[in-house]
Regions:
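Post-transcriptional modification and biogenesis factors for structured RNAs
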Residues: 7-10, 20-224
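Hydrophobic alpha-helical membrane-insertion segments
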Residues: 1-2, 13-16
């Protein structure tokens, strides 16, 4: 049973040299069931990068491949998540729409301008190109022999790419075959189905968290 008096706080990912914040925004240590007085932060307190700062900043070596995503809102949401975790690039493949797009902007909120992207006529082309550049490319799909996301541990020094598939058909079988490994989000309900942008948020957070933890341990954390 959920204790309504418990306080849940966002987990902080420390950077070696955080950007200066004039109003001193920061996270506090989590203390179970210790309610505190809290005030919502204003926009100017969030220490957000400018688009130019984002483009110049070091990125997490993680790329997202979108395989025939039909909804512009889903594409925009993935851009926004990629911006949030400072990912390298988004690969837009097949029928996946490219910026600029008013519909995409509704969910991307400008992240389509900050995050680098490349268009490929087929996701298989993107997979093979990234593999040739020594990326470990993983499909996000329900397959035999998939790796549970909760069990996945990124390797130190590796570059990764994640393939997310069409809202109805998922990742193409040929792309799954080319990847050779697949991540699956454990699910416990009746549907065993998540919206692709929701799946993207879950998987990107989990993989990025593991990759950043390794980099922090090596004292080479991302710097703005």
């Amino acid at each position: 049973m959920l204790n309504k008096n418990c306080l849940f706080l966002q987990v902080n990912i420390h950077l070696d040299e955080p950007r200066p914040c004039p109003l001193g925004m920061g996270f506090v240590e989590y203390q179970p069931c210790q309610p505190k007085s809290m005030r919502k932060l204003q926009i100017e307190e969030l220490c957000r990068m400018t688009v130019e700062e984002f483009r110049a900043a070091e990125k997490l070596p993680l790329t997202i491949i979108l395989d025939n995503i039909r909804s512009l809102h889903n594409v925009g949401s993935v851009f926004r998540t990629a911006d949030a975790f400072r990912l390298e690039r988004v690969c837009l493949c097949g029928i996946t729409a490219c910026p600029p797009s008013a519909e995409m902007h509704k969910t991307a909120l400008g992240a389509e301008d900050s995050v680098s992207w490349t268009y490929y006529s087929d996701a298989l082309e993107a997979v093979r190109e990234l593999q040739a550049q020594d990326y470990c490319v993983l499909a996000v799909e329900q397959v035999q022999g998939s790796i549970g996301l909760d069990a996945f541990r990124p390797e130190s020094g590796r570059k990764y790419a994640l393939v997310l598939g069409n809202e109805v058909k998922g990742v193409q079988q040929a792309v799954v075959d080319a990847c050779g490994q697949s991540l699956e989000i454990p699910q416990y309900g009746t549907k065993h189905s998540l919206n692709v942008s929701v799946s993207a948020g879950i998987v990107i957070w989990e993989v990025a968290k593991g990759m950043r933890s390794l980099r922090d341990l090596q004292s080479v954390a991302l710097r703005p």
